[in-house]
Regions:
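Amphipathic alpha-helical repeat scaffolds
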Residues: 33, 119-127, 241-246
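Structured adenosyl-cofactor binding patch, chiefly the S-adenosyl-L-methionine
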Residues: 96, 133-134, 148-161, 220-260
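Active-site/ligand-binding-proximal alpha/beta "capping" segment
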Residues: 188-238
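RNA substrate-binding interface of SAM-dependent RNA methyltransferases
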Residues: 99-194
């Protein structure tokens, strides 16, 4: 049993939880809790190590035992040590270090999300969850966007990251993909108070939907790349919507148009 927070394995987990740089260098990230672990493993992501405490649920213990049978390195950890790694109020008693992988892009893209300078982890995770539900084929993370595999984004995404192909790209790369002659994607940018009302735009065509950050909106590069601006009419007195709420409305307007 690991009983010290200074244990090298615990220190490695702490670094992966805290720093994007370490996640990239080690090509791995950490998921916390039974549900997220089940989502990751059920979607084909490979665990490198699993850590648990005596506080684990029966469901979690079954997961741990299954990974032990598969030869995964499993470590029991003192509850207080494992809890020190969590930024939630109650530690679920289970962590897994997962090997990073890149899900393949479909050969023909028709519906893409671009997260542009989205810095709030909760917003990005919620948007990715909505995108996966709406049938988005891939999400491109433009410069200034928070890491999709940080702990808070993973929790808010509820497993979307394990099913939705993600790419961290420059705007030059995004435009190159969207403007391929064989199957170009129209770039629609959501901009508060500007552009055509979303239901007046033709969202049945192949498209990439750009969603900017809540505080400052899309980047200058995102605005320059956009083919058309979209707005969500707000007859009330609020000046703007939460970025995740706005993205959900836009994503499912695409779904509505394509299903009717």
């Amino acid at each position: 049993m690991i009983t010290s927070s200074h244990n090298p394995k615990i220190q490695a987990v702490r670094q992966l939880l805290a720093r994007r740089k370490d996640r990239r260098q080690n090509a791995s990230f950490v998921v916390e809790g039974v549900r997220l672990c089940e989502e990751a493993l059920g979607s084909g992501w490979q665990p490198m190590e699993v850590f648990y405490s005596e506080n684990i649920s029966a469901r979690g213990r079954a997961l741990v035992e299954e990974q032990q049978k598969r030869g995964v390195d499993v470590e029991e950890v003192l509850p207080s040590v494992l809890a020190s790694l969590s930024d939630t109020e109650t530690s679920p008693g289970l962590l897994a270090m997962i090997a990073e992988r890149e899900l393949p892009l479909p050969p023909e893209l028709d519906f893409v999300l671009v997260a542009d300078a989205l810095r709030d982890p909760g917003n990005l995770g919620t948007i990715l969850r909505s995108a996966a539900a709406a049938g988005v084929q891939a999400a491109f993370l433009a410069p200034g966007t928070v890491d999709a595999f940080s702990p808070k984004v993973l929790r808010a995404g509820m497993g979307a990251q394990f099913r939705l192909p993600l790419r961290t790209l420059s705007w030059e790369q995004i435009v190159a993909i969207c403007k391929q002659p064989a199957r170009p994607l129209a770039l629609f940018l959501a901009e508060a108070g500007q552009g055509v009302p979303l239901w007046q735009a033709d969202l049945r065509q192949s498209l990439a939907l750009v969603v900017g950050g809540e505080a400052e909106g899309a980047s200058a590069e995102g605005r320059a790349a956009a083919d058309q601006l979209l707005s969500i009419p707000m007859p009330g007195q609020s000046e703007s919507l939460n970025a995740a709420v706005a993205a959900g409305i836009l994503l499912f307007e695409v779904v509505r148009q394509r299903l009717t």
